């Protein structure tokens, strides 16, 4: 119960004369309405009628407006909430002189590598494909009677290891290895000495018979005048680009070999000379085979082209125009070029991934069709 008696004014708010404006009416004896209309916000504030939440939001708005009027800072760095500079991730890092020099050296090495090996003429090819002391597994699927007392050509022979093994183990009448890289041809010729048996008389880097048959290595690039089926007198290496410059030159090609090998080179021919060069290569091989001869190819898959196409702008341009894919080779070689059949030897294993490729053997008919389209117009 309150201690004040009924009707007492103790503790109640008192209103004095100067609290309200003078005047008034019957409906507004204290004249409150006129004060509110003249300055409603000020009157509400004086009477304590303002909404505190509204007042706070207005204050925040005023503060925000004041901040927005501050001049913008012309700084290249973004600032975090603690007002400290923060690195822009889009700006390239500043390299030291040593780092710039190392980057330039790497760039030069890459350019040198791409220019030197644009034909797939890698000088460590067999080191990647084979384990030390291991024989080439592709020899296991070849038949000796394909080569024995026959004439063979190995296109893209590299350092000559496979060519030398065929010359020594399969006894061809002659086998010639050709490569576009002169350095590799020099290495292949030197390797002849290492494949000779101990009883073979060796003079310098080559068998003694080479001086009579071939002359000085530096003086000769052409094949020797005569061959013997006995190794090492049945083998020679020479620098040559097998892809002719034009289709018209195909008319001059004559049958010369019983076996032509084109192992792991189709990708490089395709990238360097495009679809026209690839077709011209196959037509020359067909024309250079005797009736009943064999073309042995080891085509690379088309999905392996993309990586090597980046080696130069020319290779990249040729790659973008390729329509004659490796999966189209078989039908075109049989139906258009004139091969009689194809024997698939399967996939041969290798030390490194990517070298496990199928080997196909195309057979030229004993009696080629005389009504076939001339080679220069296929």
UniProtKB/Swiss-Prot annotation:
GO molecular function: O-methyltransferase activity; RNA methyltransferase activity; snRNA binding
InterPro entries registered for this protein in UniProt: Bin3-like (IPR039772), Bin3_C (IPR010675), BIN3_SAM-bd_dom (IPR024160), Methyltranfer_dom (IPR025714), SAM-dependent_MTases_sf (IPR029063)
The protein's Enzyme Commission number: 2.1.1.-
CDD domains: AdoMet_MTases (cd02440)
Broadest EC class assigned to this enzyme: transferase
Residue span(s) of domain Bin3-type SAM: 136-367
This protein's UniProt keywords: Methyltransferase, S-adenosyl-L-methionine, Transferase
Feature: compositional bias, Basic residues: 1-15
Name of the featured protein: Probable RNA methyltransferase Y17G7B.18
Record organism: Caenorhabditis elegans
């Amino acid at each position: 119960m309150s201690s004040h008696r009924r009707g007492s004014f103790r503790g109640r708010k008192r209103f004095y004369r100067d609290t309200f404006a003078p005047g008034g009416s019957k409906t507004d004896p204290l004249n409150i309405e006129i004060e509110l209309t003249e300055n409603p916000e000020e009157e509400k504030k004086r009477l304590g009628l303002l909404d505190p939440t509204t007042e706070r939001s207005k204050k925040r708005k005023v503060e925000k407006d004041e901040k927005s009027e501050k001049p913008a800072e012309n700084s290249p760095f973004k600032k975090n909430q603690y007002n400290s500079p923060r690195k822009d991730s889009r700006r390239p890092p500043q390299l030291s002189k040593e780092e710039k020099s190392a980057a330039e050296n790497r760039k030069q090495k890459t350019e040198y590598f791409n220019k030197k090996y644009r034909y797939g003429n890698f000088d460590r090819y067999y080191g990647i494909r084979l384990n030390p002391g291991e024989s080439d597994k592709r020899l296991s699927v070849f038949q000796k009677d394909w080569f024995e007392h026959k004439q063979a050509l190995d296109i893209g022979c590299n350092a000559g290891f496979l060519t030398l093994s065929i010359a020594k183990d399969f006894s061809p009448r002659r086998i010639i290895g050709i490569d576009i890289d002169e350095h590799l041809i020099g290495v292949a010729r030197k390797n002849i000495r290492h494949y000779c048996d101990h009883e073979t008389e060796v003079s310098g880097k080559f068998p003694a018979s080479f001086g009579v048959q071939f002359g000085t290595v530096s003086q000769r690039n052409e094949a020797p005048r005569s061959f013997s089926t006995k190794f090492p007198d049945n083998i020679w290496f020479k620098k040559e680009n097998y892809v002719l410059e034009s289709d018209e030159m195909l008319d001059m090609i004559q049958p010369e070999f019983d076996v032509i090998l084109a192992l792991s080179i189709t990708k490089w021919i395709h990238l360097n000379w495009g679809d026209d060069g690839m077709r011209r290569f196959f037509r020359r091989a067909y024309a250079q085979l005797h009736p009943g001869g064999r073309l042995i190819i080891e085509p690379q898959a088309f999905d392996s082209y993309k990586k090597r196409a980046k080696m130069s702008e020319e290779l990249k341009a040729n790659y973008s125009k390729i329509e004659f894919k490796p999966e189209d080779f078989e039908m075109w070689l049989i139906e258009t070029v004139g091969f009689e059949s194809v024997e698939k030897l399967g996939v041969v294993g290798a030390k490194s991934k990517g070298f496990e490729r199928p080997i196909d053997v195309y057979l030229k008919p004993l009696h080629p069709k005389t009504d076939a389209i001339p080679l220069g117009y296929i």
